[in-house]
Amino acid sequence: MDPKVIIKNPTFDSSDNNPDLIKVKNVDFFYKGNKRALFNISMKIKEHTVTAFIGSSGSGKSTLLRLFNRMNDVEPKSIFKGEILINGKNIYSPETDIVKLRTDIGMVFQKPSPFPMSIYDNVAYGPRNQGVRDRKLVNSIVVENLKRAALWDEVKDNLRDSAFALSGGQQQRLCIARAIAMKPKILLMDEPTSALDPISTSKIEELITQLKKDFTIVLVTHHMQQAARVADYTAFFAKGKLIEYNKTKIIFSRPANKKTEDYITGRFE
């Protein structure tokens, strides 16, 4: 990268009109009481955008992602400090309903994880669990979300087949359909294409771009090109610290921090 084009201190570009949905304030996180994974993280994530977290393994990006739906609560002797506000409410307050929080915040994991049941029942599972009993309504939910996940045309004649009969890419889109069937406000994606072939990856990326119209998406990825293709905003993490956060086009064309520049140009792992 030509150092002449680098602006050393660009201000955070929040020129779009989307309101802030997630606010992270001075967050520290420790595993097992003494292994510090995050150092004083503060950032805001805008509604109906795709925000990518990039950085090498162990940089803290997945740890922060999992704090958004409190998945790290299960870690023994973990310590959380700071605040995470979603729609203005501190999700780490004692009054937080964890079940509702995880309904409002869907999660798609690195490895496709369909339930051991039919394609249809995978998507119907969540709504049924929330009390939806009307068969026509369940049918409409299944069809709608398989279409939104760009999977309907491939499975419409085989809805009663096992989800495990699908390819890896199809399974991941099924997991996305299952997640969005719960009508979450936020969709978290932790390396959703790392186990997929290039064609399946392309389909997931197209889907991410479409889904931000209805959801706020936070994506962890090791692939910088993927962040450049799909993300509106990108945050670069290193050793538990947020090094730089801005619009993706700024991060990739004129990063303010030398560490960011080194990472995106391949000089830093």
Swiss-Prot record:
EC number: 7.3.2.1
UniProt cross-references to Gene3D superfamilies, sorted A to Z: P-loop containing nucleotide triphosphate hydrolases (3.40.50.300)
Family matches, as InterPro entries: AAA+_ATPase, ABC_transporter-like_ATP-bd, ABC_transporter-like_CS, P-loop_NTPase, PstB-like
Keywords tagged on the record: ATP-binding, Cell membrane, Membrane, Nucleotide-binding, Phosphate transport, Translocase, Transport
GO function term, MF aspect, one: ATPase-coupled phosphate ion transmembrane transporter activity
Intracellular or extracellular location(s): Cell membrane
GO cellular component, one term: plasma membrane
Catalytic activity: phosphate(out) + ATP + H2O = ADP + 2 phosphate(in) + H(+)
Predominant subcellular localization, coarse grouping: membrane
GO biological process: one example: phosphate ion transmembrane transport
Entry-linked PROSITE patterns: ABC_TRANSPORTER_1, ABC_TRANSPORTER_2, PSTB
Membrane topology, from the record: Peripheral membrane protein
Top EC category: translocase
Start and end residues of each ABC transporter domain: 22-264
Binding site for ATP: 55-62
Family: Belongs to the ABC transporter superfamily. Phosphate importer (TC 3.A.1.7) family.
Described function: Part of the ABC transporter complex PstSACB involved in phosphate import. Responsible for energy coupling to the transport system.
Subunit note: The complex is composed of two ATP-binding proteins (PstB), two transmembrane proteins (PstC and PstA) and a solute-binding protein (PstS).
PANTHER family per record: ABC TRANSPORTER I FAMILY MEMBER 17
Name of protein: Phosphate import ATP-binding protein PstB
Native species: Spiroplasma kunkelii
Organism ancestry: Bacteria, Bacillati, Mycoplasmatota, Mollicutes, Entomoplasmatales
Gene label: pstB
